[in-house]
Amino acid sequence: MTCKIIGCGGYLPPKVVSNDELAKFVDTNDEWIRTRTGISQRHIAGDTEYTSHIALKAAEKAIADADISVNEIDLIITCTTTPDNSFPSVATKLQGYLGLNNVPSFDLQAVCAGFVYGVQVANSLISSGKYKTILLIGAEKMTSLLDWEDRATCVLFGDGAGSVILQRSDDNSGIIDSNIFSSGADYEILYTNGGVSMNGSSGKIIMQGQKLFRLAVEKMHQSIEELLRNNNFTVNDIDYFIPHQANVRIINKLAELLNVEDHKVVKTVEKHANCSSASIPLALSTLKASGKIKKGDIILFSAIGAGLTWGSALLRW
């Protein structure tokens, strides 16, 4: 038994900040940002627009897309690095917004790899027979973690949420396989310099960009090769490749190493920037809305995030 995605939805806050606007208060310019990242703009949530609020909007779109009653959902998993509160979880707040009394809900924190981790967890829970319909969300207000004077990081991130409905599959569609990994020895490559038990603050993002670029390509490449090999697939079998939308140079280098044709690679980083755990479900929602996906298509997800955490998932639509 496996599970399949029966609906998806994405939400981006209405406020858009272009590179030119960013250059008014940061020592940067549009050419510098585009050349190094491929990003032209990012969406930024308002001061009173929290992660749970943007998660709800993405969830409602996924529920509508799946054409199910909200009461069919029997578990909620929210992948996030930027919760509203230290506790309770975003997922339980979302459960309350949706009126799903007693439905178990929890947050999963694997930073930018969170959605891939969430896919594996949700698939395992549905495959066990314990749950039938899971709402899985990646939602982030990454701009709350930015030092707006650090041009190496503040140009990279945006806010947004993406959501999917996963349900038991009775045919050959659904999650084929996935893998997840972590390496705590590399945590200083990307982290925040704050935390509840450290100094009582959320901190700001600290990143070693060159090291992260190299490891991102290396780790995702290894993860994908292993996943394809273990399931007797080749790159030629892939119809759409949806990598984490962190940086177009990482995406292009990974696609080059894998020899994936460019028209199969989904790229939303230019307009979305890096939305961490929301980036893959947002990209999936964008692809689905384009009408290009057809039943039977093979889709590959891959992501890497702080931790380090990384992994990939293979599914048949």
From Swiss-Prot:
Pathway: Lipid metabolism; fatty acid biosynthesis. Its EC number is 2.3.1.180. GO terms for cellular component: cytoplasm. Keywords: Acyltransferase, Cytoplasm, Fatty acid biosynthesis, Fatty acid metabolism, Lipid biosynthesis, Lipid metabolism, Multifunctional enzyme, Transferase. The keyword Lipid metabolism applies. GO terms for molecular function: 3-oxoacyl-[acyl-carrier-protein] synthase activity; beta-ketoacyl-acyl-carrier-protein synthase III activity. Residues 245-249 are annotated as: ACP-binding. It catalyses: malonyl-[ACP] + acetyl-CoA + H(+) = 3-oxobutanoyl-[ACP] + CO2 + CoA. Coiled coil: none annotated. Belongs to the thiolase-like superfamily. FabH family. Homodimer. The last Arg residue of the ACP-binding site is essential for the weak association between ACP/AcpP and FabH. This is Beta-ketoacyl-[acyl-carrier-protein] synthase III. It comes from Rickettsia bellii (strain RML369-C). The gene is fabH.
